[in-house]
């Protein structure tokens, strides 16, 4: 493509608006990424290059630079970094305030909502918290947006990312101007009968209408069909689907069906418009009333980013129709993006915002070009094939970035459901609108839901079919930001080349960029032994990587609390997925206490584990019973550890287990599996929850020089002694601990270890030890820069 052609593209109104909005977004992204200097330098360099090649003028370059810094400044001044609730956390107290979001949960006895706190006890405060409340279903159903409530609960700060690849819940909640979480497990709340301001009364009434419609549907549809229809009509921000349905739709690539989007908005407006046309209402009143209906529908859905985007675009298009002005598609999309970010810059971190705009941009550009180029193919075939295909190309990198997965059959699943979904959506919208009219609500829903019930069952069957096919989901490593940029630049270039009918250059571009992307994934393989101590609070989980790239876990952290996720799922498995690690040589479960074995089921279900090493065959706890049950279901190979037994060898490296039987009230801890890892001159001893008594039984089989000691039982009492540290001559002590009620680590234990370098996960976050067998380096995880930073370099004794 020559310079003149590029210049023509850059003068296009759509391109001008798109580039301007892109630099505005870059300014916002620079603030959130905390790489403002780097991004500013790269952005200004791009403008300088465009100027140097005379592709843009000086005035436009200065204006775009201004837009970039305006985006950064806006974000800096608009985004809060704290509120008045933060100094109070942690605190158990009674809170007074207003529910400011639609209460929502996938479980009938639990609800989540944002809560504007006005009082803590008798103290006046101002702040917003995310509430999770558990209570009987009849109490949960009474909660509604706009209500003033009194609630007793525990105010906490959300967890931050203290491990590589870990989801940062604190950072996520900051996008909503929220810096604390409030848990109420006993349903100790009271709804107050206070007069609502007009704004909240209106939103409350609107949500009552939505709930009334869903309640009418519930007479004729049962779970999961009810939640699926509710998600299609009102979006998953307002109606949460069951977890197993969500998992099925993720595997099949159909999850977007459950999110309100442009299709929903278009259906609502079209239905309203043609009803009024049938009633012979004039054109302008039809359009204006339709715009009001769209606004009401958007408020009813819970205000998800995708439905806001679709609604704003349609509203601007309709406003243009009223004044005889046509909107340029990409310009309008760019303008809406800027408008949303002006209102809330944190939208840029919202996955729904990113997916919605990326898919829409792809459909307006790539799909539009393909439809024009293949003009001999019937439009209905092009719509069925090109739309899901192009959408998949544009969203796949984002899915890989956030979820480490690619749905292989997504395009086929979407093609299979296009017609079906159109019928379900139309009938769902029509019946829901008519259900607002009380006298005909039951009759309407009974007729429409009778048919929809069969169609929804077929939809679930299609999702399960594609979601259960072999290799339906492929795990991917975590792409870097620059790789995403290269990929999307390639898509834009390919779209432009196809538009110009330059197919040979299209193929060359695809091959060249694919090669570049492949090269960026290549990295030198470390030949060192590496041990990672994950920060799993007052629990244990260690990942060992041998010089021959074999992976072992020693313990797997805690099990899920209530309906949450295990530490293995949110920390360790995410780490493995980001690095494309799919095979684990062995998992050593030192004993069946929940804080050591709670994540085992998730590990063996999601990774290919060659051998599961268990401490004993006694299903003494619920966690143990779950492990044996899951192992049987998936045919997991199990070995029971023996005392002084080598379980793995490779050149210069051995891994040995020790197991002694000790009775008494602390038998489980004292009898837990001890592991010795040796590589050349380097040794590390993992004591699990065992202490001095256990050590004295096995010390005759241990070396006198152990460089690193993983201290037993989170640094509790009686886990080390002076004679033990003298015997091992330990230089480094690792204590895996966090907030607890047991006094871990014990002061006496820390006194004994004071002559060693103490590495506490509650202070240093995740810790990594890397060694070539002679020199070992110690790193701690920096949650600001999101990487390990070196702390010490030491020499192993010969």
Tell what function each PLM region has.
Residues 138-154, 172, 178, 195, ...:
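Non-globular, low-confidence helical/coil segments that flank catalytic cores
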Residues 15, 19, 56-65, 182, ...:
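Hydrophobic alpha-helical transmembrane segments in multi-pass membrane proteins
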Residues 27, 97, 352, 395, ...:
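Residue-level signal for inorganic ion chemistry
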Residues 1-33, 320, 430-465:
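Hydrophobic alpha-helical segments
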């Amino acid at each position: 493509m020559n310079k003149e052609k590029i210049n023509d593209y850059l003068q296009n109104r759509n391109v001008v608006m798109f580039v301007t909005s892109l630099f505005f977004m870059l300014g916002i992204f620079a603030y959130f990424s905390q790489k403002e200097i780097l991004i500013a330098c790269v952005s200004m360099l791009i403008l300088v290059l465009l100027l140097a090649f005379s592709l843009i003028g000086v005035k436009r370059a200065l204006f775009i630079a201004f837009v970039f810094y305006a985006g950064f400044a806006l974000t800096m001044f608009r985004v809060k970094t704290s509120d008045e609730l933060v100094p109070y956390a942690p605190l158990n107290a009674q809170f007074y305030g207003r529910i400011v979001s639609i209460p929502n949960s996938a479980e009938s006895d639990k609800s989540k909502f944002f809560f504007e706190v006005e009082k803590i006890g008798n103290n006046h405060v101002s702040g917003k918290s995310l509430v999770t409340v558990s209570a009987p279903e009849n109490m949960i159903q009474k909660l509604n947006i706009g209500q003033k409530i009194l609630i007793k609960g525990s105010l906490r700060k959300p967890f931050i990312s203290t491990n590589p690849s870990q989801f940062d819940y604190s950072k996520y909640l900051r996008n909503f101007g929220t810096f604390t979480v409030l848990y109420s497990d006993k349903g100790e709340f009271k709804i107050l009968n206070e007069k609502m301001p007009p704004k909240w009364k209106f939103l409350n009434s609107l949500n009552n209408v939505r709930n009334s419609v869903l309640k009418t549907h519930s007479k004729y549809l049962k779970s999961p069909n009810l939640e699926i229809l509710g998600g299609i009509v009102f979006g998953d921000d307002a109606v949460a689907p069951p977890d197993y349905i969500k998992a099925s739709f993720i595997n099949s690539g159909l999850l977007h069906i459950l999110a309100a989007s442009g299709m929903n908005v278009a259906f609502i407006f079209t239905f309203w418009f043609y009803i009024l046309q049938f009633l012979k209402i004039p054109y302008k009143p039809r359009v204006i009333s339709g715009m009001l209906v769209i606004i009401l529908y958007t408020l009813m859905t819970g205000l998800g980013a995708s439905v806001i985007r679709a609604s704003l675009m349609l509203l601007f298009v309709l406003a243009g129709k009223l004044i005889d002005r046509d909107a340029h598609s990409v310009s309008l999309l760019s303008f809406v993006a800027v408008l949303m970010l002006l209102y809330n810059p944190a939208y840029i971190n919202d996955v729904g915002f990113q997916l919605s705009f990326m898919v829409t941009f792809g459909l307006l550009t790539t799909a539009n070009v393909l439809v024009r180029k293949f003009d001999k193919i019937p439009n209905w075939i092009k719509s069925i094939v090109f739309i899901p295909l192009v959408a998949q190309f544009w969203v796949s990198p984002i899915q890989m970035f956030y979820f480490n997965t690619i749905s292989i059959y997504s395009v086929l699943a979407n093609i299979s459901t296009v017609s079906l979904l159109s019928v379900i959506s139309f009938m769902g919208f029509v019946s829901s609108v008519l259900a607002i009219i009380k006298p005909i609500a039951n009759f309407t829903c009974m007729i429409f839901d009778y048919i929809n019930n069969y169609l929804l069952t077929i939809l679930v069957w299609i999702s399960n079919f594609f979601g259960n096919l072999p290799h339906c989901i492929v795990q991917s490593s975590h792409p870097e930001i620059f790789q995403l940029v290269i990929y999307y630049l390639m898509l834009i270039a390919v779209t432009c080349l196809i538009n110009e009918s330059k197919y040979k250059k299209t193929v060359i571009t695809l091959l060249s960029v694919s090669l570049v992307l492949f090269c960026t994934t290549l990295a030198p393989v470390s030949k060192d032994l590496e041990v990672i101590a994950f920060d799993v609070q007052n629990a244990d989980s260690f990942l060992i990587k041998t010089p021959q790239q074999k992976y072992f876990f020693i313990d797997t952290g805690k099990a899920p609390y209530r309906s949450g996720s295990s530490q293995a799922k949110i920390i360790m498995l995410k780490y493995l997925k980001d690095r494309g690690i799919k095979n684990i040589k062995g998992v050593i479960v030192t004993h069946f206490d929940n804080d050591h074995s709670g994540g085992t089921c998730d590990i063996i279900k999601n990774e290919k584990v060659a051998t599961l090493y268990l401490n004993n065959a006694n299903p003494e706890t619920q966690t143990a019973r779950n492990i044996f049950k899951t192992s049987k279901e998936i045919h997991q190979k199990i070995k029971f550890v023996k005392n002084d037994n080598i379980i793995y060898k490779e050149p210069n490296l051995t891994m040995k287990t020790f197991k002694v039987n000790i009775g008494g009230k602390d038998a489980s801890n004292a009898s837990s599996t001890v592991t010795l890892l040796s590589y050349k001159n380097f040794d590390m001893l993992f004591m699990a929850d065992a202490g001095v008594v256990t050590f004295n039984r096995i010390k005759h089989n241990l070396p006198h020089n152990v460089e690193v000691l993983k201290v037993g039982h989170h640094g509790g009492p009686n886990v080390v002694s002076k004679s033990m540290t003298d015997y091992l001559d330990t230089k480094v002590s690792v204590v895996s601990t966090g907030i607890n009620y047991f006094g871990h680590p014990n002061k006496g234990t820390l006194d004994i270890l004071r002559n060693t370098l103490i590495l506490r996960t509650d202070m240093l976050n995740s810790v990594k030890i890397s060694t070539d067998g002679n020199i070992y380096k110690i790193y701690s995880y920096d949650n600001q820069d999101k990487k390990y930073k070196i702390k010490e370099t030491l020499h192993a004794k010969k």
